[in-house]
Amino acid sequence: MFLIKNFIYLLRIGVIKGAYRKFNFISEYLKVSKVKINRLQFIIYLLKSEIIKKKQKSYLQNKKNYYQKKYNFTDIDWFSPNIPIWDTVLKQAFINKEKIEYLEIGTYEGRSTIHICENFKNFKITVVDPYNEYNEVNSVVKNSNMENVFERFKKNSFNFSDRISINRTTSKEFFKKNKKKFDLIYIDGSHHYLDVKEDLTNSINFINNNGIIILDD
């Protein structure tokens, strides 16, 4: 009875369907490659991976709903899918560090900034964004008014203003004047090749030993 109940539950939430689809796909590959595996263990592994994926999806949706209700965000969300990997890596990387200097290039409404503020209390944050009208955002956000976006960011980050330094300028101009080094740098500004290359080059010069640079490109 226990097995039947669990089977029905897994079937209801769509886990078995996903695992079955993966099993068929990989089984075809194994036939061609002639690799032998324990099929029962493999099926259990696939079921577990599907359960984890479902839980993660539910977690992300709850997180997204929470931020949508609490802050002034639009439906445009490039950051939330990155939350699990960010949380895992950052908690491990900075577990014994009391103060983290974090630089964010490209902030938009502040989803990543707010997530860091709420979940990593020892982070001091420097954000850089000119909030100009630029094509790569407007291709996704039609008629986007960057002044309005900037106002939303200021409202969203108001309660954390003691931890956030806002630099409304280009990353190029920021790095010309900057003298501080950072433990974590997130590059999510211009997505044009030469701009990204320049941001990465500058970031390497201003990253602390054992620091982390994240690129969203």
Each model region followed by its residue ranges:
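S-adenosylmethionine/decaboxylated-SAM
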Residues: 63-77, 83, 87-217
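Membrane-proximal basic amphipathic "stem/tether" segments
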Residues: 1-74
